């Protein structure tokens, strides 16, 4: 855990993600990424030099998923847990019968999450995007939209006053996977009908295939995003790429 905390601490410091007395909500979907983020932030809270409040929010899509494991983990970590019930799943798959539901689903989930954050009085939302997510998003934007773009480490949502932070951007996906298994985190089974059949999965496979020939591909892309840099991607400290992790 110390290695992951070190990478997270460096990312937080590089982008000034956490300030004193922040009220941070972790968006917990039930997937491994958000659960690892929750575990690490709960641990970081114990010794970080800037005190901050931490709570967890889960948006229940109305697809019959069991979130009791998340509630138990939050109790163990002494992190208040908020389960926000919605009918997003039935609206998309039963009423609207969307053929390409991912975009609408994402917008509706973001809307529900942002509203919950405002209602509960948080000023920051921590999201579980990791190193590989950033690389995949960059390649997706290039291939599907013809844009040099990616989400930002810190995003200020002007209309709401919410600031999104992504503290795990220096942590590789396989490191997240291994940590989640080692800690036996309560990953929730995803009952989305289109899970694993998205454009992101296609790009993930493409990057994997290219990496067999170009082993440093992901590191080159991530480094270019910081050195170019993309908007808001230039770190405050001297860039030192995250090395391959166990």
Annotate each PLM feature:
Residues 53-54, 132-212:
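Catalytic subdomain that performs nucleotidyl-dependent activation
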């Amino acid at each position: 855990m110390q290695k992951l905390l070190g990478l997270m601490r460096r990312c937080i410091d590089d982008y000034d993600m956490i300030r004193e007395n922040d009220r941070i909500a972790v968006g917990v979907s039930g997937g491994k990424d958000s659960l690892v983020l929750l575990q690490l932030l709960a641990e970081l809270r114990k010794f970080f030099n800037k005190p901050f409040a931490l709570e967890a929010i889960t948006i229940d899509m109305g697809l019959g998923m069991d979130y009791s494991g998340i509630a138990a983990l939050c109790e163990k970590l002494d992190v208040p847990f908020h389960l926000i019930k919605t009918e997003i799943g039935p609206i998309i798959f039963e009423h609207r019968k969307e053929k390409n539901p991912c975009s609408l689903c994402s917008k509706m989930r973001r809307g529900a999450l942002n509203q919950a954050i405002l209602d509960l009085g948080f000023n920051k939302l921590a999201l579980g995007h990791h190193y590989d997510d950033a690389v995949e998003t960059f390649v997706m934007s290039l291939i599907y939209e013809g844009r040099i773009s990616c989400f930002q480490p810190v995003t200020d949502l002007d209309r709401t006053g919410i600031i999104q932070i992504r503290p795990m951007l220096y942590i590789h996906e396989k490191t997240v996977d291994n940590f989640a298994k080692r800690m036996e985190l309560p990953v929730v089974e995803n009952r989305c009908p289109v899970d694993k059949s998205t454009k992101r999965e296609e790009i993930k496979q493409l990057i994997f295939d290219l990496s067999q020939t170009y082993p440093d591909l992901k590191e080159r892309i991530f480094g270019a995003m910081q050195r170019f840099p993309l908007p808001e991607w230039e770190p405050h400290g001297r860039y030192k790429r995250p090395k391959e992790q166990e």
